[in-house]
Amino acid sequence: MEKFYKENEGKPENKGRAEDEGSTEEGGKADEDKSDAEGKPARQGKLEVEGGPGEQAQQKGEGKPEKQGKSDGEGKRQGESKPDSQAKSASEARAAEKRPAEDYVPRKAKRKTDRGTDDSPKNSQEDLQDRHVSSEEMMRECADMTRAQEELRKRQKMGGFHWVPRDAQDALVPRGQRGVRGVRGGGGRGQKDLEDAPFV
């Protein structure tokens, strides 16, 4: 039963805890006095609203900080105004009504790509020049690639395709260039007949 109330601390739905609030406030004040003596920041708003026994509130205040980030008063000193902390605790209560602690979803972090947009004009001009140079280089490379592909096609036409039937080769290749050995006039096939080889 105690764990259930610890998970739902600070919610207005906690019923039957009004009797314990007086002891919580006393325990919260004792905790603040201890933190002032040690020189640590006091936890103001949340301990008054929590609604648990005073001893548990003190143990929780001295232990690990809450992961859900509900204690806004952690970073403040005792000397700051109390109405401000009460206003924050009221806004926290409204936020707790909207979404329970179990459904807590962290906010999205800022994307790192947005940081690079604030460059100086000098850097942006240099980047533009680099991009322009790189685009020219890409155009040259593209032209080189097309030339290389054309040369490859010519070589393939000259050398002959060994996997294409001979009748189809005749239409593609000029008359004197048909043989693999480069014999003038063709001189027959350059390789042994593959049709005569027995299948394994």
Curated annotation (Swiss-Prot):
Instruction: List the subcellular locations.
Output: Nucleus
Superkingdom of this protein's organism: Eukaryota
Specify where the region named Disordered lies, as residue ranges. Answer: 1-200
Q: Which InterPro entries match?
A: TF_A-like/BEX
Single GO cellular component annotation? nucleus
Q: Where along the chain is composition biased (Basic and acidic residues)? A: 1-49, 61-85, 94-106, 114-153, 190-200
Q: Indicate whether tRNA processing appears among the record's keywords.
A: no
Q: Kindly indicate whether the keyword Transcription regulation belongs to this entry.
A: yes
Q: What is its main location?
A: nucleus
The alphabetized UniProt keywords are:
Nucleus, Transcription, Transcription regulation
What Pfam families does its record include?
BEX
Q: Which family does it belong to?
A: Belongs to the TFS-II family. TFA subfamily.
What's this protein's function?
May be involved in transcriptional regulation.
- The name under which this protein is listed is Transcription elongation factor A protein-like 5
